Amino acid sequence: MDAIKKKMQAMKLEKDNAMDCALLCEQQARDANLRAEKAEEEARSLQKKIQQIENDLDQTMEQLMQVNAKLDEKDKALQNAESEVAALNRRIQLLEEDLERSEERLATATAKLAEASQAVDESERARKILESKGLADEERMDALENQLKEARFMAEEADKKYDEVARKLAMVEADLERAEERAESGESKIVELEEELRVVGNNLKSLEVSEEKANLREEEYKQQIKTLTTRLKEAEARAEFAERSVQKLQKEVDRLEDELVHEKEKYKFICDDLDMTFTELAGY
């Protein structure tokens, strides 16, 4: 009987232990289920986060590609702008060189104009000198004509005296020797007068030749003055053309400077846009 009681007590104890063990196992099972559910929830949450991150990554990659494409376009625009700026600088340099050459040509034309003006002044002075000399020659010619008239008058007087001597020789034969002497004296005087007349004639011819030469020189000087006047007009025309060319080049330089300012503003706008793009990329 005691053995049965002991056995029943032992079985009851085993039962209690089994119940406790079962309760413990159930609790552990519930805890395991809770942990499993929590793990599944965390896994789903992580999956959502991973999906969101992948979506964000795709958007970021797409934005990065757009930004890179935009950056490439900006680089190309910047290169084009730099090329245009270089071309404009080259054009400005060429225009400045043309302007310098035009200024040199203008200076040369101005110097030639001054030389031509000086030559005209010298020609005018020479013309005035020739006019004065021509007046002096005319006065000398008048004086020589007067001398010639006097010589002719003296010759006529000599002829009269010769006739008188001849008549006296015919009328007074006794006074032949004295009359001959007087006749010889008259002849000598006639010879002298003829020589003087010949000299006057030669002088007159020389004066005529000098007058012809003076007229020729005057014509030459007139031709030189005409040529110099033509050259002066041509120089003035070249100077006016050079001045118009300089004004035209100045307008072209002003226009190129305006284009350069516009390109600089365009270049600044591109740089600002690039800075903004880099700032946006840095924010990502």
From Swiss-Prot:
<comment type="function">
    <text>Tropomyosin, in association with the troponin complex, plays a central role in the calcium dependent regulation of muscle contraction.</text>
</comment>
<feature type="coiled-coil region">
    <location>
        <begin position="22"/>
        <end position="266"/>
    </location>
</feature>
<dbReference type="InterPro" id="IPR000533">
    <property type="entry name" value="Tropomyosin"/>
</dbReference>
<dbReference type="Pfam" id="PF00261">
    <property type="entry name" value="Tropomyosin"/>
</dbReference>
<dbReference type="GO" id="GO:0042803">
    <property type="term" value="F:protein homodimerization activity"/>
</dbReference>
<keyword id="KW-0514">Muscle protein</keyword>
<keyword id="KW-0020">Allergen</keyword>
<protein>
    <recommendedName>
        <fullName>Tropomyosin Per a 7.0101</fullName>
    </recommendedName>
</protein>
<dbReference type="GO" id="GO:0006937">
    <property type="term" value="P:regulation of muscle contraction"/>
</dbReference>
<keyword id="KW-0677">Repeat</keyword>
<keyword id="KW-0175">Coiled coil</keyword>
<comment type="subunit">
    <text>Homodimer.</text>
</comment>
<comment type="similarity">
    <text>Belongs to the tropomyosin family.</text>
</comment>
